[in-house]
Amino acid sequence: MGPHRLLYQALCKAGDKFVYPVLPAFAKPAWNHAAGPKTVFFWAPTIKWTLIGAGLADLARPADKLSLYQNSALFATGAIWTRYCLVITPINYYLSSVNFFVMCTGLAQLCRIAHYRYQNPDWETKEIMETHN
């Protein structure tokens, strides 16, 4: 058994001993849920929220500096995984919600890119000139 596994088990035991007793009655079932905070099904989406933060931060960037491919990938994977999270067992609404917002941030950026390119028909020429200078 690796040291990371021992650390994880020790943290779960400490949580069961110190956190679980002080939880309100409505939160206790969530603590031991199959997608609760003692599983990767909780922590993976929690960490994935940073993608939404990055997408929101990109709203401050000029649309001509956004990547069409990156935002297409965020939109597509967000859509696919949102659906998948609703058909797996256990159904993971938390993971589904984070993927839904990944899809939304990707879509918002794709709309910004499309709007920029529509408003600036010579965008491709400008891009080529900037890369050669």
UniProtKB/Swiss-Prot annotation:
UniProt KW keywords: Membrane, Mitochondrion, Mitochondrion inner membrane, Transmembrane, Transmembrane helix, Transport
GO terms (BP aspect): mitochondrial pyruvate transmembrane transport
Cellular location(s): Mitochondrion inner membrane
GO cellular component term of the entry, any: mitochondrial inner membrane
Principal location class: mitochondrion
Membrane topology note: Multi-pass membrane protein
Pfam family membership, one: MPC
GO molecular function, one term: pyruvate transmembrane transporter activity
Domain of life: Eukaryota
Transmembrane segments: 40-57, 73-91, 100-116
Keyword rRNA processing assigned: no
Keyword Mitochondrion annotated: yes
InterPro entries linked to this entry: MPC
Role played: May mediate the uptake of pyruvate into mitochondria.
Cited PANTHER family: UPF0041 BRAIN PROTEIN 44-RELATED
Family recorded in the similarity comment: Belongs to the mitochondrial pyruvate carrier (MPC) (TC 2.A.105) family.
Name of this protein: Probable mitochondrial pyruvate carrier 2
Organism of derivation: Caenorhabditis elegans
Encoding gene per record: mpc-2
